[in-house]
C-alpha cells in the first residue's frame, strides 16, 4: 500500500511539475506515457459492468401434504432440502439443472391462489380499506356479482319448489269465465254518444289505475250519469267486471280495458257493414248492366240509305271559341253597360253605393271608401286604409285599457283618412285636388267675380242695363282706410290652406300614445310638418361695421372706425 501511494504521489507531482519523478530519473525509461494516468483514473469505472441487470426469478416452495405417503417406504427418510430464499436470483446452472413441467407449475399456481383466497375475508378487507386501486375495485365488483347471482339462484329454486309442491298434492280447479252481458255494450254506447269517458264518472275515486271501486260507488255513478239500465242489468255488469279482477273487485284498469275492447269491436263491425254495403251496390250495378244492353238492342234500327247526305252548314262566326270564364266576363260587361245607360247618377257615386255597406259612422264610412285612383295604386291604397283602420281600433282598445285621456275624435283625426271628396262643377265631377291646390281654376279671382263668370253672359247683360253710379269724392285718409280694408278682404277671401293639412296622419308628429311599456320613437311618423326656423346667428346680430380684427385661435369682433390705441414694445 505504501509503495502504491508513493508511486501515485510521485506521478501526480511530476504531472504538476513540482518535483521530478522516478520515471524521469530513470535513464532507460522512455518518454512520459499518458496511458498509465488514464488507466489509473478510469480504474474504478472499469470495475462496473454497464449492462442491464439480470431478471430475478422468485420460486416459492410449497410444503408437502401430510396424507401423502412416500413411494419407497422402506428407504430411510432423507433430510428435507434447505429452502431457497424467495428473493435470491437463481444462477444459470440451477435453472438448467431443475427443469419444471407446465402442468406442475399450473397446479402450484392454482393451489397458491386457493390458499390466498382462504387466507381471510377479502370483501370485508376491501370494504374497510380507505382507498382502493382499480384492480382491487374490479375484484370487489366480481365478489358482489357472484353473491347476487347466488341469491337469485337460491330464490329461483325456492319458487320452483313452492310451485311444484302443490301440483303433486292437488289438481288445479278450473275457473269459470262469465259471458259478457249485453248491458255493458249498451252502457258504453250511451257514454260514447254523450261524449263521457268511463274514467271521468268516478270522480270520487283516486286516480290510480289499481284503485278499487266498490259496488255501491259503481251503482251510484251509473245512476248519476243517467244510463237507461235496470237494476238487474247493473248487477250483471258489476258481477262481470268483478270476476275479471284478482280479488273479485272492480278496478280502473279493468274499466279501461273493457272500454277499449268494446271500441275496437265497434270499429270492426262498422268496417264489416261498410264492406257489405259496397258489395251490394257493386252487385246491383253489375245486374243493371246487361238489362240496359238488352234495352238498347231491342230499340228499332233505322233502315240504311245508300244516298249521299248533305253536309251541315257551319253557322258559327269565324272566331276563336270562348271559354266559360270569358263568356261570363262578356255577360258582366254587357249588363253593366245596360245599367249605366239607365242610371241618372255619376259612375263614382254608383260604385260607392254598390261596393260599400255603411256602418252609420261618417268618419268610418269616408275612411273605408274605395279609392278613385286607377291602376295598381288603387289596390295598394285600399289595403293601407284597411290596415290603418285596424291600427285605429287597436289604439282605441289600448287607450281604454290603460286609461289614457285620448278621445275618439283625436284618434280619428290622426289615423283615419278623410276620404276622397266628390266635387261637382256644372254637373261634372272635378278631379281630386293635389295637396295645397284649389278645387277650381279661378284661383286668383274673388268669389263675386267667379260667380259672375259661372252665371254666364245673360246675367252680365242685366248689369249693363242698370244706370251707372255717380262717382264719389273721397279724402286721402278715407281712401287709405278703404284700400287697407280691401287688402284684408282680398287676403281673407283667398283659399289659404296649409300644404300638410290634406295628408292623413299629419298630426302624428304631435300626437304620441304614452304607454308604460313602449318607448316613443319619432322615426315611426309617416308624415311630419316641416317648419323652417330662423338661423341661429342671423346677420342682425353682427352689423356691417363690426368685423373680426385678429385671425388666431379665437376671433373677436370690434368697431373698426373707433379710436385705436397702438403700443410699441
From Swiss-Prot:
Where the record annotates domain EF-hand, the positions are 193-228
Chain segments carrying region Disordered: 63-85, 147-172
Task: Please give the InterPro entries that the UniProt record associates with this protein.
Answer: EF-hand-dom_pair, EF_hand_dom, EFC12
A GO molecular function term, named singly, is: calcium ion binding
**PROSITE patterns, per the entry:** EF_HAND_2
| Record-listed Ca(2+) binding positions | 210, 212, 217
Q: Where is the composition biased (Polar residues)?
A: 148-159
Q: Which UniProt keywords apply?
A: Calcium, Metal-binding
Q: What S-S linkages are listed for this chain?
A: none
- PANTHER family from the xrefs? EF-HAND CALCIUM-BINDING DOMAIN-CONTAINING PROTEIN 12
Name of the molecule in the record: EF-hand calcium-binding domain-containing protein 12
Q: Which gene encodes it?
A: EFCAB12
